[in-house]
Amino acid sequence: MTRYKAIISYDGSGFYGYQIQPNARTVQAEIEKALKKMHKGKNVRITASGRTDTGVHAKGQVIHFDSDLDITADKFQKALQVMTPFDISFLTVDEAPADFHARFGTVGKEYRYIVKRTKIFDPFSRNFALHYPYELDIAKMKLASECLIGEHDFTSFCSARTERDSKVRTLYSIDFYEEDEETLVIAFQGNGFLYNMVRILTGTLLDAGQGRISSEDITEALLARDRQKLISKTAPPQGLYLWRVDYE
């Protein structure tokens, strides 16, 4: 039995998230369906670095699975590329150590959120970015982001449905890239992220850019450890991308 590590990308628009759900199209279900065909009806379970929600995309999701097929990793990659749907891509497949674990072995992740600042709505980007036709002060957004960097209890910045006992996470950086006059990319790097955390942080920073909230408001929300203390809305899923997963 050989363990394989794969880096995959997917367009989340047509999926009800990553994780298998009854009577729903998911990324995990489509990949396991392909692996089952390759293994002549035998179920092969895959494990990912983490789940993504409905409509959320991935540029560098990492999964692992075990197989007893006598084929090379390169052939695995080519076969899975053909056998999975057009909205999933296998970027790499490599043999991995037997103790490699896509979820528990992570030391950091990067998420990016894409904001389109066009005055007129672009229907061709509706599934891949947030349309935000309002003025933004990027300097205020950067200032607001500074109080979020470091180790904090992010209870105020995650969904009440978060299942984790500890809400303490470390944000290494929040960077802002203006790719052009119309496109703003917000990149979040940290040791881990809670349910809806990046989308709530994005909504908060957009409010800061509009002057609706200040750095002091964000600091107070952090200390309150109560989602109800934060007035910012959760940014919609279509602008969010799991960009990269890091391992030791």
From Swiss-Prot:
CDD domains membership: PseudoU_synth_EcTruA
EC assignment: 5.4.99.12
InterPro entries with a match to the protein in the record: PsdUridine_synth_cat_dom_sf, PsdUridine_synth_TruA, PsdUridine_synth_TruA_a/b_dom, PsdUridine_synth_TruA_C, TruA/RsuA/RluB/E/F_N
Coiled coil (residue ranges): none
GO MF entry, a single one: RNA binding
Self-association and partners: Homodimer.
Family: Belongs to the tRNA pseudouridine synthase TruA family.
Stated name of the protein: tRNA pseudouridine synthase A
Native source organism of the sequence: Listeria welshimeri serovar 6b (strain ATCC 35897 / DSM 20650 / CCUG 15529 / CIP 8149 / NCTC 11857 / SLCC 5334 / V8)
